[in-house]
Amino acid sequence: NLLQIGIMKRCANKRRRPVFHYRDYGCYC
């Protein structure tokens, strides 16, 4: 899903807190 990929990239760039269930939810930023 393109929307999920965009969210994951944005969250990966922030790296504020650990990412849980990265594949399922994207992240908890």
Swiss-Prot record:
**Can you tell me which family this protein belongs to?**
Belongs to the phospholipase A2 family. Group I subfamily.
**Tissue-wise, where is it found?**
Expressed by the venom gland.
- Signal peptide from the UniProt entry: none
Q: Tell me the GO molecular function terms.
A: metal ion binding; phospholipase A2 activity; toxin activity
What's any GO biological process attached to this entry? phospholipid metabolic process
Primary localization: secreted
Its Gene Ontology cellular component terms are:
extracellular region
State how the cofactor is bound.
Binds 1 Ca(2+) ion.
Cofactor(s) in the UniProt record: Ca(2+)
Describe PTMs of this protein. Contains 7 disulfide bonds.
InterPro entries, A to Z: PLipase_A2_dom_sf (IPR036444)
Function (record text):
Snake venom phospholipase A2 (PLA2) that has myotoxic activity but no significant neurotoxicity. PLA2 catalyzes the calcium-dependent hydrolysis of the 2-acyl groups in 3-sn-phosphoglycerides.
Documented EC number(s): 3.1.1.4
Q: What is this protein called?
A: Phospholipase A2 acanmyotoxin-1
Binding residues for Ca(2+), per the UniProt record? 28
What top-tier enzyme class does this entry carry? hydrolase
Q: Where in the cell is it found?
A: Secreted
Gene3D superfamilies linked to this entry: Phospholipase A2 domain
